[in-house]
Amino acid sequence: MIDSKTVLLGLIGHPVEHSFSPIMHNAAINDLKINYVYLGFDISNENLKNVVNSAKTLSILGFNVTIPYKVEIMKYLDKIDDTAKFIGAVNTVKIENGEAVGYNTDGIGAKKSLEEEIGKFNNKNILMIGSGGSSRSISFELAKENEITIINRNIKNAKELSFEISKNLATKEYGEKYLKYGDLSTDISKFDIIINTTPVGMYPDVNSKPVIPLKNAKNDAIIMDIIYNPFEPVFLKEAKKYGLKTLNGLGMLIYQGAVSFEIWTGFKPDTNVMKNSIVNLLKS
């Protein structure tokens, strides 16, 4: 029951009406029987600068940050933890002793989701589609034990991210790795895992997909899309058409959310409860 002592958590982004985050976080809250509530806030770009001070004023404990503000939010924070600073993007903010502190849990969320599907992995050749905040966090996490190639419509952004990965995290000297879209017709067959980190195909633009020649992908490639609404984006439908194994963004959402939840509350949520809340919603 919400009362004057209820602690407020939330999600900021634009849009947010598609998000399952409130569903799964409130399910975890109810399961733990703690007096919290998690709400979604659709924030326009011009109002982003007011979010942090508003959270402090309203005694909001913390919030997730989603597309398109994971990078821009950083300039309004008081502190940023080393991992998020290294990545250059924030998806979790906690108000600690009057200061807004930024974290990033996306990378570990994506890794845990992949591990749930295929087990522990390393030395994989991975193609990352996109170079935004989500791509940065996932790339830096996976580059610790794998080889990452970036593809993006803006080749300059792809090159910059690839350079940062090569300079800071590569476990072996393989140099910068990035591609133009035109290169994929021949190069795509070398990738073990292909991950779409862009919002292309996300609700409400559900009929769009990245222009990637999946018909040329290797037979045992894993095709992941971090989108979870729709549950099966067009990109994954196409992958299935070619007999490829697919993974949507639900697992990543749950695992990154569980880490965020623990940062805010100190409680470890039951990820099965979080997952079932979304699965039951989709079934209904």
UniProtKB/Swiss-Prot annotation:
Gene3D superfamilies, A to Z: Leucine Dehydrogenase, chain A, domain 1, NAD(P)-binding Rossmann-like Domain
InterPro entries named among the record's database cross-references: Aminoacid_DH-like_N_sf, NAD(P)-bd_dom_sf, SDH_C, Shikimate_DH, Shikimate_DH-bd_N, Shikimate_DH_fam, Shikm_DH/Glu-tRNA_Rdtase
EC number(s) from the headed UniProt entry: 1.1.1.25
Pfam families assigned to the protein according to its UniProt record, in alphabetical order: SDH_C, Shikimate_DH, Shikimate_dh_N
Catalysis: reaction(s): shikimate + NADP(+) = 3-dehydroshikimate + NADPH + H(+)
GO BP of this protein: amino acid biosynthetic process; aromatic amino acid family biosynthetic process; chorismate biosynthetic process; shikimate metabolic process
Binding site for shikimate: 19-21, 66, 91, 106, 228
Family that this chain belongs to: Belongs to the shikimate dehydrogenase family.
Complex and partners: Homodimer.
Designated name of the protein: Shikimate dehydrogenase (NADP(+))
Originating organism: Methanococcus vannielii (strain ATCC 35089 / DSM 1224 / JCM 13029 / OCM 148 / SB)
Name of the gene encoding the protein in the UniProt record: aroE
